[in-house]
Curated annotation (Swiss-Prot):
It comes from Staphylococcus aureus (strain Mu50 / ATCC 700699). Signal peptide: none annotated. InterPro entries: Arsenical_pump_ArsB (IPR000802). This is Arsenical pump membrane protein. Belongs to the ArsB family. Involved in arsenical resistance. Thought to form the channel of an arsenite pump. The keyword Secreted does not apply. Keywords: Arsenical resistance, Cell membrane, Membrane, Transmembrane, Transmembrane helix, Transport. It is a multi-pass membrane protein. One of its GO terms (biological process) is response to arsenic-containing substance. GO terms for molecular function: arsenite transmembrane transporter activity. The chain crosses the membrane at residues 3-23, 25-45, 50-70, 99-119, 137-157, 180-200, 222-242, 244-264, 275-295, 316-336, 372-392, 408-428. It is found in: Cell membrane. Its main location: membrane.
Length: 429
């Protein structure tokens, strides 16, 4: 059973990351799940249990991405980025910091995938338009992709990993926010400092801002642009209401996304069919399929091994517990992707004999490691692989070697500082 469960998991993961001939990750994961079921590695009751765990998370994620795609077509993100350029007043370092801050805001409210895949092309087009050299463009591209994950901690909806973990342990919106806002601020500050130290020689000191277009020129539909702000406010209230009513957050995000789609249908700036097609629907199939495969590892007793390791680490106190869990999840995410990692770790945490604040430390450290760890390698998250593909289409080629060399140097210190932020949060608040 153990060998079979491990083999099914590894082969499924290999095909998910490899994607031969464009094989859809949803189909791959469901195939792995089907094999796991027919071989008896998982039962039909496991299938229903997995569906119960991931349906809210994945539908929330898809809804948020749908909303962000409409906002992108309206021009909200480009409008924001142009404001950042104007605020920089020709100062290269200010522009670098402001772009990072914008990325952090977008990641918080529209998920890491939305920030990386929507904001990066906008930033790339802008720095090219300003006339930056390839050497000067690289820091801005890396920063846009890096910050999308490192600051995707504050809200449950900021990352699919967050939603899945919060759902698994029944953590509400407000409680989650109260525990992760300080680590997110630590991560943001650490990211700015580490990225600046790493790229300081490549970032231009000044740039010509005379030819930058006016922010209003980025708006493709003024009426829908104004409505967008109302939608964002309602979305935030929806998150809060879900906390107190115990109604799944996907219900609120789904209704808001549907209404926004109906309003956008009349806009010439938004191609509804293109927006719906662009949503990551395959993530729903991938999540269900991959987690069924992961449940096979649980049934085979593999997650119990990790649970014992976590119990051992917890004997050394809260600080060691947080650092240990954070770096374990970061390492696992970097070598086998953060999606299966977060659930494997969550199952192990649930199986471990750890309680109280120590268990809370494990839960949130797992999220932090699974959010930040993927930046170490290109295979750490599906968003990174897609991000690299988008850049290649725009004639910006980043080799896996270059990415790894950059990723490991800038991720490790940021991860450590972020975990310190979590530790301080738990002992003070």
């Amino acid at each position: 059973m153990t060998t079979l469960a491990t083999l099914i998991f590894l082969v499924t993961l290999l095909f998910v990351l490899w994607q031969p001939k464009g094989l859809d990750i949803g189909i791959t994961a469901l195939t792995g799940a089907f094999i796991a079921v027919i071989t008896g590695v998982v039962s039909f009751s496991d299938v229903f249990e997995v569906t119960g765990i991931v349906w809210n998370a994945t539908l929330t994620f898809v809804s948020v991405i749908l909303i962000s795609l409409i906002l992108d077509k309206v021009g909200l993100f480009e409008w924001s980025a142009i404001h950042m350029l104007h605020a920089s007043k020709g100062n290269g370092l200010k522009m670098f910091v402001y772009i990072i801050l914008l990325g952090a805001i977008v990641a918080a409210f529209f998920a890491n995938d939305g920030a990386a895949l929507i904001l990066t092309p906008i930033v790339l087009a802008m720095v090219k338009n300003i006339g930056f050299s390839k050497r000067a463009i690289f820091p801005f591209i890396i920063a846009s992709g890096f910050i999308a994950d490192t600051t995707s901690l504050p809200l449950i909806v900021s990352n699919l990993v967050n939603i899945i973990s919060a759902d698994y342990f029944h953590v509400g919106f407000v409680r989650y926010f109260s525990r992760m806002i300080i680590p997110n601020l630590f991560s943001l500050l650490a990211s700015i400092i580490v990225l600046w130290l790493y790229f300081r020689k490549a970032i231009p000191k000044t740039f010509d801002d005379n030819n930058i277009k006016h922010p209003k020129d980025a708006i493709n539909d003024l009426k829908l642009f104004k409505i967008s702000w109302i939608v964002l406010v309602i979305l935030l209230f929806g998150y809060l209401i879900s906390e107190f009513t115990k109604i799944p957050v996907s219900i609120f995000t789904g209704i808001i996304a549907f209404i926004f789609l109906m309003l956008a249908r009349k806009s010439n700036a938004v191609n509804i069919k293109q927006v719906i097609k662009g949503a990551p629907w395959n993530i729903v199939l991938f999540s269900i399929g991959m987690y069924i495969v992961v449940f096979g590892l649980r049934n085979a007793g593999i997650t119990l091994i990790l649970a014992k390791i976590l119990e051992y680490i917890s004997n050394y106190g809260l600080f060691s517990t947080i650092l240990g869990m954070g770096f374990i999840s970061a390492f696992l995410s970097s070598i086998m992707n953060n999606m299966p990692t977060v659930l494997i770790d969550a199952i192990a945490i649930g199986q471990s004999n750890v309680h109280g604040m120590l268990k809370e430390g494990l839960i949130y450290a797992n999220v932090i490691g699974s959010d930040l760890g993927p930046k170490i390698t290109p295979i750490g998250s599906l968003a990174t692989l897609l991000w690299l593909h988008v850049l290649t289409q725009k004639d910006v080629k980043i080799s896996w070697g270059t990415y790894f060399k950059t990723g490991i140097i800038i991720t490790i210190p940021v991860l450590f500082i972020t975990l310190i932020g979590l530790y301080l949060t738990l002992i003070i608040f």
